[in-house]
Amino acid sequence: MIIHSIFLLMVSITLVIAEESDNVLFDKRAPTGHQEMQGKQNSASLNSENFGIFKRALMGFQGVRGKKNSIINDVKNELFPEDINKRAPMGFQGMRGKKASFDDEYYKRAPMGFQGMRGKKSLEEILDEIKKKTTRFQDSRSKDVYLIDYPEDYGKRVLSMDGYQNILDKKDELLGEWEKRAPMGFYGTRGKKIILDALEELDKRGVMDFQIGLQRKKDTTFDDYLDYAINPFDYEKRSTDFQDVESGSESFKRARMGFHGMRGKRDAAGIYGSNSSTVGTIFGYQDMRNRGNNFPVYQVEKRSPFRYLGARGKKNPRWEFRGKFVGVRGKKSSLQTVF
């Protein structure tokens, strides 16, 4: 009987010790997750009275983010309006945050493009630019001159063209279409396309067309000539340097200068007529043997040394005497070794 009672006492003591050991293990270990980062969740925090205040994040870094204090939020909501102090859900509060209500009106921007900086061009400015561009030419001093600056002489002639009349007649219609554009992009620079269609013909016209109208037709007969006197004896000769080409000699395999074997020389009498005369003007030079030679110089009618025939006279024929080409492309001058 005594042994049986002792055995029951030992079993009961063992059960009590086992229950206490289970409670110790439950207090030392967290149910899930890393113990160092989140630790054990206190069972007291699951109480319904403290649930809203002491509830911690189940995962992540508790010390970094954690739970916001509801008391502080309540105080903020009471002291400050919600629409002003409401923060962005993510990002940096100081950089992004909520803008004040008056910022939208104070810092109001244009919808698109640099509307405030560049603005819209008026139709009159565009027409003036096109007129200046298409009525520009250069005078004898390479200075730009615009026809619209001289309306009494040239303005009527240029502005009577079909292109300008078409624009001036439709000015009111184009201006109405110009004002209907939506405020987007660089609309001040580009403008409405209907205006570009109307001005396309004027934009494609060359500047030289107005030079022909002002200064008459350009004389292109003697464009490649030089203002030098010529020797008539050289024009009576023809090129005979290619007579031995078929013989295969080394000296006749290539033309010496220009097309002198194919075209030869021009006849001076055929160019200037039979009325031209040789006068007593003497042009002297010395050859390789230092023998003086004098040749009469073929004189031509004096003309204005400008290019335009009608307005400024006809240009002198440029026959070269000192260079390698005596004529246009003719025979090589025998006098080139002296000069």
Curated annotation (Swiss-Prot):
The lineage of its organism: Eukaryota, Metazoa, Ecdysozoa, Arthropoda, Hexapoda. GO terms for cellular component: extracellular region; synapse. The modification Glutamine amide is found at Q38. Residues 19-27, 41-54, 219-252, 267-301, 333-339 form a propeptide. GO terms for biological process: chemical synaptic transmission; neuropeptide signaling pathway. This is Tachykinins. Strong expression was detected in the queen and forager heads, while weak and almost no significant expression was detected in the nurse and drone heads, respectively. The gene is Atk. The modification Arginine amide is found at R65, R96, R118, R190, R263, R312, R329. The modification Tyrosine amide is found at Y154. Residues 1-18 form the signal peptide. It is found in: Secreted. It comes from Apis mellifera. Belongs to the tachykinin family. Its main location: secreted. Keywords: Amidation, Behavior, Cleavage on pair of basic residues, Neuropeptide, Neurotransmitter, Secreted, Signal.
